[in-house]
Amino acid sequence: MGRLGLTEILVIVGIVILLFGGKKIPELMKGLGSGIKEFKNAAKDDQPAPAKKQEEEQK
């Protein structure tokens, strides 16, 4: 019951196009993509840090 079907997705896309217009959507997607990229980079930078601390503690 919590899944979106094809009809619901098409309705959502139609509403987004009506609200933002065709010219604004590429700008929104570009901003969303850059935000996701920054988030992934930040997450990747945080992961190696604990491994380095453990190596320093063992020395």
From Swiss-Prot:
Main location: membrane
Gene3D superfamilies per the UniProt record, alphabetical: 1.20.5.3310
Keyword Transmembrane helix: yes
Membrane topology qualifier: Single-pass membrane protein
Transmembrane feature ranges: 1-21
GO cellular component: a single term: TAT protein transport complex
Matching InterPro entries: TatA/B/E, TatA/E
One GO MF term attached to the UniProt entry: protein transmembrane transporter activity
GO biological process: protein transport by the Tat complex
Keywords: Cell inner membrane, Cell membrane, Membrane, Protein transport, Translocation, Transmembrane, Transmembrane helix, Transport
Membership in a protein family: Belongs to the TatA/E family.
Functional description taken from the UniProt entry: Part of the twin-arginine translocation (Tat) system that transports large folded proteins containing a characteristic twin-arginine motif in their signal peptide across membranes. TatA could form the protein-conducting channel of the Tat system.
Protein name listed in UniProt: Sec-independent protein translocase protein TatA
Source organism of the structure: Flavobacterium johnsoniae (strain ATCC 17061 / DSM 2064 / JCM 8514 / BCRC 14874 / CCUG 350202 / NBRC 14942 / NCIMB 11054 / UW101) (Cytophaga johnsonae)
